[in-house]
Amino acid sequence: MRVLVTGASGTIGSAVARALIGRGHTVVGTVTAADRPVPAGVEPLVADLFDPAALTAAAASVDAAVHTASSNDERAGELDHTVVGALIEAFAGTGKAFAYTSGLWLHGNSGDTVTTEESPFDPPLVVSWRPAVEKLLEDAVAREVRTIRIRPGLVYGGGRGYVPMLLSPQNDDDGAVVRHFADGSNRWSVIHADDLGELYALAVESAPAGSVYLGTLDESVRVKAAAQVVADKHDARVQDWDPTDAQQYWSVMVEAFLLDQVATSAKARKELGWTPSQPGLLEELAAL
């Protein structure tokens, strides 16, 4: 297949592109500028994803699409609505696959109740627009678009993603310190980018229309344990960070990173034969 991947230079998009190419597919990857790096074999396409006409033109020459791009700012919801709307219109009546990157944050706090694809929505403010976008994809099945919604946990791998930034050692008057929001007792549900890329490739190839999959490891990571791994490596101490103070730097993201989540990817493993095999988050952090 010839597959359009939005955000091909990003953490998720580049992993999806590598997985698709590794399975024999051709990838057209959107980038924001010609000098943005993309995986070997990707056909880069400079495109303004806020422009529906550009998306319609890009979709005309492909057999499937995967949307992973994000503006990572206050326009993220607008971008998703634009991309999803344009690609649904372009693919209507064709049966072509369109995989959308949602997220596990959509489900909010789980506590000790294991989140599945059927768990209710309770998103933090930063992704409060996502239920409406997911509804567009759900409804598009009736228009003969093979939509697939993938909800990844917190993505890591190769030193990329939010985790290395969040837990990066800082210096104060007493030396190096690794800070986590509040007491760090909450759990992150996580997934390596390369494992996630394989999930997307499998889903694009064979997932039924309207499918939803959680893309995460079944064992969550306690945030303070992750912080301790980084601290030990850098001879630093671990410190609680008052969420109110942290909001000066991380704004609405603090609420999301404070979520306590446990989840299962049993559905993806059973239906698609997905088998995550990359190092876990703690192993990754110890190696950085």
What are these regions (language model features)?
Residues 2, 197-253:
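Mid/C-terminal beta-alpha module of Rossmann-like enzyme folds, strongest
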Residues 134-158:
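Conserved beta-loop-beta element that borders a ligand/cofactor-binding pocket
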